[in-house]
């Protein structure tokens, strides 16, 4: 299977290259970067020396014509320039940008941008939409925060047990992207945790969309924060239930919901160090007097982005969804 990556020089693109380097069925034949066009991949991503001798190309679609599937790992507003033409050429697409995660009207309102060439996609949270993904030509890879939050709350939302849920999320700095800024500057983040886009983060609308499929009247609050680490998203989901459930009942609900999901592990406790560098989402459940706290941990670059994209690629191309991804986390 021949694959391409449009936008391969950033963190998400380089993580795709890392994962695909050892995929037994995938060969990367084209990887684009406007900034590094003509340079060897390993000269830009030095950790990949010995794995790729390919040069970065331009994002012109002629460079991707021989691909069976293309990943678009570009900023929102850019993927829509490529996706319709790729689909028209018979090439399947996993879009890692935000361009196809929401319906057209919501996207234009939330992102403040007219959506040119809108095509309906399958939302690529694999554990929720596995069968639809198998038949899809276009999969919209979820955002990193929605991956951790939706997986944390879905088992209870499916049973319509949630009165309201408060998502308190902390993300590593790679979630802000590769481009340096005052926000990501070392002195501003060192020994600090910084909340941002409070009540305004665009990922909120993915949570509403997906959890609303289970429970239309669910009430959601979401506060993202950045901590001075490179990878990982820890979500504390404060779930206020309709009725009471014992610890045993809660764990049974989660274990049954995810019994066929290799990459979701129900644990007694979780931490970011237990999932680093892997495609796992670890979840623990902690009932209290007035709420249940569900904690989820993911690597934002893997399960929160490139790993889940490869998981979706596997299903789209008829492979086992774990192919090339059965890698234990890095520990310590």
From Swiss-Prot:
Gene Ontology BP, a term: L-arginine biosynthetic process
Gene3D superfamilies according to UniProt: Dihydrodipicolinate Reductase, domain 2 (3.30.360.10), NAD(P)-binding Rossmann-like Domain (3.40.50.720)
Record's keyword annotation contains Ribosomal protein: no
Record GO terms (molecular function): N-acetyl-gamma-glutamyl-phosphate reductase activity; NAD binding; NADP+ binding
Subcellular location: Cytoplasm
EC number(s) recorded for this UniProt protein: 1.2.1.38
Main localization (coarse): cytoplasm
Active-site feature positions: 144
Record bears the keyword NADP: yes
Reactions accelerated catalytically: N-acetyl-L-glutamate 5-semialdehyde + phosphate + NADP(+) = N-acetyl-L-glutamyl 5-phosphate + NADPH + H(+)
Pathway(s) this gene product operates in, as recorded in its UniProt entry: Amino-acid biosynthesis; L-arginine biosynthesis; N(2)-acetyl-L-ornithine from L-glutamate: step 3/4
Top-rank lineage group of the source organism: Archaea
Enzyme class: oxidoreductase
Key words of the record: Amino-acid biosynthesis, Arginine biosynthesis, Cytoplasm, NADP, Oxidoreductase
GO cellular component labels: cytoplasm
Family, as annotated: Belongs to the NAGSA dehydrogenase family. Type 1 subfamily.
Function: Catalyzes the NADPH-dependent reduction of N-acetyl-5-glutamyl phosphate to yield N-acetyl-L-glutamate 5-semialdehyde.
HAMAP family from the UniProt entry: ArgC_type1
Name used for this protein in its record: N-acetyl-gamma-glutamyl-phosphate reductase
Species of origin: Archaeoglobus fulgidus (strain ATCC 49558 / DSM 4304 / JCM 9628 / NBRC 100126 / VC-16)
Phylogenetic classification of the source organism: Archaea, Methanobacteriati, Methanobacteriota, Archaeoglobi, Archaeoglobales
Gene that specifies this protein: argC
